[in-house]
Swiss-Prot record:
SMART domains: A1pp. PROSITE patterns: MACRO. Residues 1-23 are annotated as: Disordered. Belongs to the MacroD-type family. One of its GO terms (molecular function) is deacetylase activity. It comes from the Archaea. This is Macro domain-containing protein MA_1614. SUPFAM superfamilies: Macro domain-like (SSF52949).
Amino acid sequence: MDPQKPYKKELKRNSRKRSLNMSQNSERIRIIERDITELKVDAIVNAANNTLLGGGGVDGAIHRAAGPGLLEECRTLNGCPTGEAKITKGYLLPAKYVIHTVGPIWQEGTKGEDEFLASCYRKSLELARKYDVKTIAFPTISTGAYGFPSERAARIAVSQVKEFLKVNELPEIVFLVCYNKEACKNIKKALEENL
């Protein structure tokens, strides 16, 4: 399955960074309810833990689908702090790269969780730009076992992606991948509110 096929469009490449109007910006964001491990995009984002050695949820699914090469490469990275991101090859995944980011554990909003989550999106997008990633897929970071409220996380995700796309040509398309209808509803609402 190639989710980007119907959405491919050529962007004028005047420079690596340029100002994009809001309608172009919004057209570059797609909301889909799919298995992120099956997407044929340049990079998928892994909602990882600090060790980067696999875990539950999307992290475990990505490690299983990518095969043992991913774990071997992750062992060489020496973990990742919360709010940061690191990149590896995709191995057996359809995606060329996996960008691993460590979201915050929700603690009632008292430990800077919003900024850590925002940083996850920014740092992942910065790595994507650095590696010339044209299409990237994000899961809903920190909303599973880490307990971040889904609506709040959706608003942060949408605002960070839109802010980045305003001034960057790459990635061309950002997929926000929902694991259920509730997550999709929250992301759609956040996107509508952030027009």
